[in-house]
Amino acid sequence: MLAVPPRFDVRSRPIETARLLLHPLDATDSRDLWNAVESSRAHLEPWLPWVPFNSDLDSSGRYAEASAADWDAARACRFSIRDRANRRFIGVIGLEAFAHLHESVELGYWLRTDASGRGLMTEAGRAVLDWAFGPVNAHRVRVAAATDNHASLGVIRRLGFRFEGIARQAERCNGRWLDHAVFALLVTDQRTIS
């Protein structure tokens, strides 16, 4: 079974990397979440179907509150990603779709445009995978990205995921159907992280 560490415990002791702090997303992140999405809307909309629905500060607040509730109900664990040096909010990474019986989760993430291209999402991904295979007790982590989302596919490859196949027209986003490249990583896989 999956084991979900209490949100308040993780909030008081966030996951730290060389450049990042990851703490559970909650209502205190609402304004920063809104600003990050708004400043990166054109970059995010082609790949993430929820972006048009994040239309104002209230919608960001509802999402942040729902994220906290999902964590408390052991449905998902979403983290705000902050720059460790200045505490600036730069994105979200999380484990979604908890299948407790099968010890399986899905990885999801996004980064604001002006933080892209510096290896920050790969760094956050490594930390969350360590957490997933450690305290959360996941056996399998799945991730998918649009077949033409080269930045996301690069993160997935650098994290050492194994390609499993193509899910045709898996998601409708911004008026077009996206094929997804599907990958997974098992706790028993040797993690060849580049």
Give the predicted meaning of each segment.
Residues 1-32, 36-43, 78-194:
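Acyl-donor (CoA/ACP) binding surface of acyl/acetyltransferases
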Residues 45-66:
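Conserved GNAT-fold acetyl-CoA-binding loop/helix
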Residues 66-67, 131:
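A generic secondary-structure signal
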Residues 69-74, 161:
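Short loop/turn motifs at secondary-structure junctions and domain boundaries
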Residues 47-50, 71, 110, 177:
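Tryptophan-centered motif/residue detector
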Residues 47, 51, 74-78, 139:
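Short, polar/charged, Gly/Pro-enriched helix-capping and turn/loop motifs at alpha-helix termini
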Residues 55-56, 71, 190:
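A short hydrophobic/aromatic micro-motif that marks alpha-helical segments and, especially, helix-coil
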